[in-house]
């Protein structure tokens, strides 16, 4: 697959979340964080419809923007998910990609006096 040939059937939106939980964290990392949201095909056609959500979090050394990386001739996860929902092979869901990267070089998904309240951010604010 050529990287320039992907045209999503659903919609990808990029947001910025201002986090109270991460404001003033011990590492001085940003409290404004990127948040990506994918809505499946047909989402805008039924404004009252409700969809389950899936939260995609990367491993310790992963960064949010790494989800867009691809291996040669293979689709990345956002493209695979879009294709799966467009074909109807899975029930439609909203997919949310969350950034919890720290200046220590890894993502955190817990509340810690050393890094900040990432679990609170993830579970209560996102």
Language model features with spans:
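Non-catalytic cap/lid and distal C-terminal segments of serine-dependent acyl enzymes
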Residues: 1-125
